[in-house]
């Protein structure tokens, strides 16, 4: 089983307040890729994703942070989606990931951590889908924070790949701005992961999460097991007794 890989990424700096956030998708998206969008708006209020997207979470106070995924059909590369929100500035990051079928085993996120500090710290995630256990997961760490901190932040240890950050700028009051940052961990086969903390330049209200994208199942997984009797092959479903 091979680790999933990042095909491409995109960021959107939403520097103008709007109730309809136009979010960039990655330039390269292949059919079957897992698309994930991470979105933070500088005001609370539920985010609305287009049809076909499945939300991991949608959490507010004082800002709103959400994430959603979709199995790509291959037409999405270089396009945008519109996310509805309470009118505000925003920041978004999008990933296209190959090597998993999200329709079989959807990606997973942690419950999420929150606080007010200069160290947004994602919580632990032990994926349960596909039976759980140690696998070649692709791990991502996310932080969303209110304010005008230096962007990008310092990322958690080992999260050195595919680092992406977006922000809403510095115009207007500090509370009208936000930041979001995401990074991929170096490959790690494990049953769970608890990233270290991000480091930002100024303390403020934040939320942080850990994500896991499952590896594709091995060839033949779930297929009938072939047995031989007297040299003649025949199929027998794996769960059947006697075998």
Task: Identify the role of each PLM range.
Residues 1-243:
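Primarily extracytoplasmic/secreted proteins
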């Amino acid at each position: 089983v091979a680790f999933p890989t990042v095909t491409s990424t995109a960021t959107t700096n939403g520097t103008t307040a709007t109730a309809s956030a136009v979010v960039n998708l990655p330039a390269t998206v292949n059919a079957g890729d897992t698309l994930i969008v991470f979105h933070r708006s500088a005001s609370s209020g539920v985010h609305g994703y287009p049809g076909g997207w499945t939300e991991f979470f949608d959490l507010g106070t004082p800002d709103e942070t959400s994430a959603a995924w979709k199995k790509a059909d291959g037409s999405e590369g270089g396009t945008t989606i519109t996310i509805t929100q309470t009118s505000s500035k925003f920041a978004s990051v999008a990933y296209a990931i190959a090597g998993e079928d999200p329709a079989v085993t959807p990606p997973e996120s942690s419950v999420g951590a929150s606080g007010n500090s200069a160290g947004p710290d994602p919580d632990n995630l032990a994926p349960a889908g596909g039976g759980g256990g140690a696998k070649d997961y692709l791990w991502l760490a996310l932080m969303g924070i209110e304010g005008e901190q230096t962007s990008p932040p310092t990322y958690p240890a080992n999260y050195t790949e595919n680092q992406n950050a977006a922000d809403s700028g510095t115009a207007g009051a500090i509370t009208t701005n936000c930041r979001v940052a995401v990074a991929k961990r170096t490959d790690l086969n494990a049953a769970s992961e608890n990233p270290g903390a991000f480091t930002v330049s100024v303390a403020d209200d934040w939320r942080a999460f850990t994500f896991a994208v499952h590896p594709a199942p091995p060839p033949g997984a779930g297929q009938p097991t072939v047995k031989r009797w007297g040299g003649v092959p025949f199929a027998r479903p794996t769960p059947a007794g006697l075998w």
